[in-house]
Curated annotation (Swiss-Prot):
Superkingdom of the source species: Bacteria
Chief place of localization: membrane
Gene Ontology cellular component annotations, sorted alphabetically: plasma membrane; respiratory chain complex I
UniProt keywords, alphabetically: 4Fe-4S, Cell inner membrane, Cell membrane, Iron, Iron-sulfur, Membrane, Metal-binding, NAD, Quinone, Translocase, Transport
Taxonomic path: Bacteria, Pseudomonadati, Bacteroidota, Bacteroidia, Bacteroidales
Membrane topology: Peripheral membrane protein
Protein name: NADH-quinone oxidoreductase subunit B
């Protein structure tokens, strides 16, 4: 039995010969090397990282209850790549700060963030974590977690609905997919300069 191989029609070299753009591109690739392999690896690694984010929760109020609802069977955030919430910061990729953060809790939250491996992400959930909420004018409340941590995604609400939490988590996935893993994930520049100021 004879197997028929399809012929692949290629573009003749003569069509490329007089194209200045292609000649300049080939010259540039020959001089400086190519980043095609690194780009493909970036895409593959970011796909894996974005679809296997493990959250660490720092919940102090009603927003934490909504986060529990997202993890339950009705919403099931595991189907979007957010597996079981981790209890240790060393196993987590992102921290979800939900609820009022007091000045006394701020150093503990900062220590948890510092113990996470890079690259790490922060989601501020609810009005209390974003801006202090109804306790904003109180002397002991931190007016937003972004005073001590670099926040990647803000999810407003008091408390936000489970659908809003899922949407915010999916937005974080999109952000992770767009990052450059090789030479691009440097989060130190995004951190607040003086955490004691808060």
């Amino acid at each position: 039995m004879e197997v028929k191989k399809p012929t692949i029609k290629s573009i003749p070299y003569e069509d490329f010969k007089d194209n200045e753009y292609l000649e300049n591109m080939v010259k540039q690739l020959n001089e400086g090397g190519t980043k095609v392999l690194v780009g493909c690896l970036d895409d593959l690694i970011n796909w894996g990282r974005s679809n296997s984010l493990w959250p660490l929760t720092f919940a102090t109020s009603c927003c934490g209850i909504e986060f529990m609802a997202v993890g339950a069977a009705r919403y099931d955030f595991a189907r979007f790549g957010f597996e079981v919430a981790r209890a240790s910061p060393r196993q987590a990729d992102m921290i979800m700060v939900a609820g009022t953060i007091t000045h006394k809790m701020a150093p503990v939250l900062k220590r948890l963030y510092d113990q996470m491996a890079d690259p790490k992400y922060v989601i501020a959930v609810g009005g209390c974590a974003i801006s202090g909420g109804p306790f904003k004018k109180s002397y002991h409340v931190l007016n937003g977690v972004d005073k001590i941590l670099p926040v990647d995604v803000y999810i407003p609400g008091c408390p936000p609905r489970p659908e809003a939490l899922l949407y915010g988590m999916i937005q974080l996935q999109r952000k992770v997919k767009l990052e450059k893993f090789f030479g691009g994930v440097n989060r130190k520049e995004n951190e607040p300069q003086n955490p004691e100021q808060a």
